Regions:
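Substrate-binding pocket helix/loop in short-chain dehydrogenase/reductase
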Residues: 99-100, 107-112, 204, 208
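Conserved glycine-rich cofactor-binding loop
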Residues: 8, 15-16
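Active-site helix of classical SDR
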Residues: 123, 158
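Short C-terminal tail/terminal secondary-structure segment
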Residues: 147, 228, 239-252
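Residue(s) in the substrate-gating loop at a strand-loop-helix junction
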Residues: 142
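A glycine/serine/threonine-rich, flexible loop-to-helix segment
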Residues: 175, 187-212, 222, 252
Length: 252
């Protein structure tokens, strides 16, 4: 039996990068997957097509995780399509990087609305759809929550808030048999990282690799494989944890 056989999972921000990889790996592990996206329908459809081509089951649903009505619709459509919900992965992210002097109030609120309010809204909605057997929540945080980088003050603060939220909720939701954990990726090769200037051969990439004991940047599948484990019954006694997946970069 596959690790996530008969499970239904919602993965937010799953049209590309880490979210897309998690969706694909969940499907390969037997889960029925909702590929959520905010604006990239083409990317989400591509992920769904790849999953179905490989024998999996997935649908794409548009929703802005910072919009309460959108979030409510996301989970109602999931329930209608698959009849239940077992796993929620909060991966949708606003990655704004700038010196503190250049951060506008609008950019600040956008980051917190997506990175912090978004998980609040999705978790509230998910709790209404988990059956009496409990559920599983994975928040995709960042190593930047523990080791912030220059020009990433607001982004780092949102992820630190998400980690605190995860720990607090583990104490609140354990009695409902709902597990919740954070995964803190290290320097991972994604479109978001590239938009922040961490491109192949850049000084940023060289710095990250030099400080990573395993000598390379992570790939989205490195994070996805950890997510499959945390989502599975193999991790049944793991909750409230901040699980670093960084090639050793944040192992100090």
């Amino acid at each position: 039996m596959k690790k996530l056989e008969n499970k239904v999972a919602v993965v937010t921000g799953a049209s590309k990068g880490i979210g897309a990889s998690i969706a694909k790996h969940f499907a390969a592990a037997g889960a029925k997957v909702v590929v959520n996206y905010a604006s990239s329908k083409e990317g989400a459809d591509k992920v769904v097509n790849e999953i179905t081509k490989n024998g999996g089951t997935a649908i794409a649903i548009q929703a802005d995780v910072s919009n309460e009505a959108d979030v409510r619709r996301l989970f109602e459509e999931t329930q209608k399509a698959f009849g239940k919900l077992d796993i929620l992965v909060n991966n949708a992210v606003a990655q704004g990087y700038a010196p503190i002097e250049q951060i506008s109030a609008e950019a600040f609120h956008q980051s917190f609305n997506v990175n912090v309010l978004g998980p609040v809204l999705t978790i509230q909605a998910a709790l209404k759809h988990f059956d009496g057997k409990g559920g599983n929540i994975i928040n995709i945080s960042s190593g930047a929550s523990k080791y912030p980088l220059p020009n990433a003050s607001v982004y780092s603060a949102t992820k630190a808030a998400l980690d605190a939220f995860t720990i607090a909720l583990s104490k609140e939701l354990g009695v409902k048999n709902v597990r919740i954990n954070s995964i803190l990726p290290g320097a991972t090769d994604t479109e978001g990282a590239a938009s922040a200037g961490v491109t192949k051969g850049s000084d940023y990439e060289k710095m990250f690799i030099a400080n990573t004991p395993l000598g390379r940047r992570g790939q989205p599948e490195d994070i996805a494989k950890a997510a499959v484990f945390i989502a599975s019954d193999d991790a049944a006694w793991i909750t409230g944890e901040q699980i670093t997946v960084s090639g050793g970069m944040y192992g100090f």
